[in-house]
Structure formats: structure tokens, C-alpha cells
């Protein structure tokens, strides 16, 4: 599945990035509602687990009127940011865009579900 959000968003601290468009639909193991920041991964498999590769890439900046400082994002599983996916960018000025990306493999046990998101974890 590929989901995108091409319009500029202001994402508050501890809030999720919202994905507005489903470019490529997944299968019944991946569920997303356009406009939501949550994606549900379901362990629909005949094996003991279903493995998913989750990746994120995006351009980030400090909005006009903001204070220059580090911006931190992370892929979150069930609302908890995964430390190894932390993406940090420190623009020199407001409205200076920089690119960040991260990826993670997730194992979802058979019959279980997990929700993933990309969260602003800046202080």
C-alpha cells in the first residue's frame, strides 16, 4: 500500500501526520481511511506471523512564526514511537525544507492487529 499527503500540514507535538490519499491500495491485511494518521496492520496469515516493511519519507520545516530548532519524527506502533526510527532535522531558518526518511520491519502475530503512524516527537 502507498499512502501520501502532498499538501503542507502543521503537525503539533505528539500528533500524527495525516495521510490524505491512497495511491496504491493494499490487501485486506492493511487498512487505512483517507485523512487519518493511523494504518492498521492485521496478522491475516497461515503462518505464525505476518511481516510488514513500513517506510516513511517526507519533507519537513519549521513553519513561519516558529522557533528554529530540531524537528523529530518517528514511526509509532500502537501509539508508542520506535526509537530506532527517529528522524531528526535541524533547519537553519523557518520555511527551510529538509528531507527525512526511516523504515522498520514489523512482525504481527497471527490473528492480531497493530496500528502504525508517523508522529511528531519534537520537544
Model-based region annotation:
Residues 57-115, 119-123:
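Terminal beta-strand-rich extracellular "head" domains
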